[in-house]
From Swiss-Prot:
The keyword Hydrolase does not apply. It comes from Mus musculus (Mouse). Interacts with ARL14EP. GTP binds at residues 20-27, 64-68, 124-127. It is found in: Cytoplasmic vesicle. Pfam families: Arf. GTPase that recruits MYO1E to MHC class II-containing vesicles via the effector protein ARL14EP and hence controls the movement of these vesicles along the actin cytoskeleton in dendritic cells. Transmembrane segments: none annotated. It comes from the Eukaryota. The lineage of its organism: Eukaryota, Metazoa, Chordata, Craniata, Vertebrata. GO terms for molecular function: GTP binding; GTPase activity. This is ADP-ribosylation factor-like protein 14. Its main location: cytoplasm.
Length: 192
């Protein structure tokens, strides 16, 4: 993976929340990014936390929170320190599951702790027949409307092959840099 790099002690850190329904591919995606290979995963009960060093000298602490229905009720608890949200959608699923995913996405965006944080939706499983495109997900999830107050991007990807992951994380790091500059500027004005 092109974004991975050796540890740099002077790198900046960012806390990223990785959410999506169960079986959307969150853990597969995270371990593909971290180890540049596909690892066998099991359903996440609770959460996984991994630190991923990017070439941009930014270290991401990625919180991969389980997507089972019972776990979704505690997603809000993980938002407090999040500086970015990556939401994974299984684009090959049926209408009911996609609608459930859309509802959960809409709900999590209402959390006060992440009201302006950047969002990247990873439109996963593009390798499967009939998978919805990034444009389809943008429309179905009403991303333009729901994310009008923040930077957002919808990236088609395949967690198994790694296709599109570099681009999605690169976009997120661009957003994070911009988000930090904005927050630092606001902090300066608040001090005056």
């Amino acid at each position: 993976m092109g974004l991975l790099n050796s540890k740099n002690p002077q790198s900046k850190q960012a806390h990223i929340l990785l959410l999506g329904l169960d079986s959307a591919g969150k853990s597969t995606l995270l371990y593909r990014l971290k180890f540049a290979e596909t690892l066998a995963t099991i359903p996440t009960i609770g959460f996984n936390v991994e630190m991923v060093q990017l070439q941009s000298s930014l270290t991401l602490t990625v919180w991969d929170v389980g997507g089972q229905e019972k776990m979704r009720t505690v997603w809000d608890c993980y938002c407090e320190n999040a500086q970015g949200l990556m939401y994974v959608v299984d684009c090959s699923e049926g209408k009911k599951r996609l609608e459930d995913s859309r509802k959960e996405f809409k709900h999590i965006l209402k959390n006060e702790h992440i009201k302006n944080t950047p969002v990247v939706i990873l439109a996963n499983k593009q390798d499967l027949p009939g998978a919805l495109s990034a444009e389809d997900i943008t429309r179905m999830f009403k991303v333009k409307k729901l994310c009008s107050n923040r930077n957002w991007y919808v990236q088609p990807c395949c967690a198994v092959t790694g296709e599109g992951l570099d681009d999605g994380f690169r976009k997120l790091t661009e957003f994070l840099k911009s988000y930090r500059r904005t927050r630092e500027t606001l902090a300066i004005f608040k001090q005056k």
